[in-house]
């Protein structure tokens, strides 16, 4: 597949190389970045998009299926990003995109391994957006929806990746990727793209309840409805906190 993509890019007038190392090892990840630096002189943009599926209900899931999904999605993204990170920090420029999924952000039956790995992308992004802020390294996450070969590995799901449904074509995800890879990219944000629609999701926290030092289970039970009420809530992230501190410094 890598060679096919290289050929497509070359035929379109671009320049590309293929590296077939596994992202699931630090050695493989480092070789990917080393090859890119050797061929192009640097790394400006990293899109962590390697992925597999091993779908089963949690009761029936073999832990080997858990491990391999974590290795490719979560560890693989972490390894390649770690290899590229010093390059970007040194030149004070970089754009990183983690590919997440609504299966992790919102949940989906039979994808505990995949969902956990994909939600982990948001955790990495949240931290690296803070660490890269002063170095102009911007880090975001994308949850795409498209008709791809990966989706075709789900039992019972039929796709035609060579001739996808026009409204589920991967090219409808591309504008979001280009935005996150551009000089004008935001940072620390999660975007959703697919079917011609683009949106953003975020973490919110409600006002909370103040009880003091004598709080008990019964107190929480009595106020349970108020505790879970999100009608009055505020977007919250470590990045927002740091940005506010910088404004007030």
Predicted regions and their residues:
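C-terminal helical subdomain
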Residues: 141, 161-248
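The beta1-alpha1 cofactor-binding region of Rossmann-like NAD(H)/NADP(H)-dependent oxidoreductases
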Residues: 20-34, 63
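A short, exposed helix-loop element centered on a Lys and neighboring polar residues
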Residues: 81-82, 126
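Substrate-binding pocket helix/loop in short-chain dehydrogenase/reductase
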Residues: 57-58, 62-67
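Active-site-adjacent segment of SDR/Rossmann-fold oxidoreductases
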Residues: 106, 122, 127-137, 183-185
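The catalytic Tyr-X3-Lys active-site helix of short-chain dehydrogenase/reductase
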Residues: 71, 104-107, 112-120
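Residue(s) in the substrate-gating loop at a strand-loop-helix junction
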Residues: 101
């Amino acid at each position: 597949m890598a060679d096919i993509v290289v050929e497509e890019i070359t035929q379109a007038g671009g320049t590309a190389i293929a590296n077939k190392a596994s992202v699931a090892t630090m050695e493989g990840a480092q070789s990917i970045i080393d090859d890119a630096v050797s061929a192009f002189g640097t790394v400006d943009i990293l899109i962590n998009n390697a992925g597999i599926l091993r779908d089963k209900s949690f009761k029936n899931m073999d832990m080997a299926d858990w491990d391999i999904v974590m290795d490719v999605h979560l560890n693989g993204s972490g390894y390649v990003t770690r290899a590229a990170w010093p390059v970007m920090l040194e030149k004070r420029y970089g754009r990183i995109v983690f590919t997440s999924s609504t299966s992790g952000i919102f949940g989906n039956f039979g994808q505990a391994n995949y969902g956990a790995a994909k939600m982990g992308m948001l955790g990495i992004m949240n931290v690296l957006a803070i660490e890269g802020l002063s170095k102009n390294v911007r880090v975001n996450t994308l949850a795409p929806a498209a008709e791809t070969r990966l989706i075709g590995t789900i039992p019972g799901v039929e796709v035609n990746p060579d001739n996808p449904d026009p409204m589920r074509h991967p090219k409808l995800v591309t504008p979001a990727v280009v935005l996150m890879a551009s000089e004008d990219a935001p940072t620390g944000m999660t975007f959703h793209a697919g079917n011609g629609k683009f949106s953003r999701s975020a973490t919110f926290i409600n006002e909370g309840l103040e009880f003091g030092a004598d709080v008990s289970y019964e107190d929480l039970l009595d106020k349970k409805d108020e505790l879970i009420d999100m009608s009055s809530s505020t977007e919250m992230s470590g990045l927002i906190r740091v940005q506010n501190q910088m404004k007030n410094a």
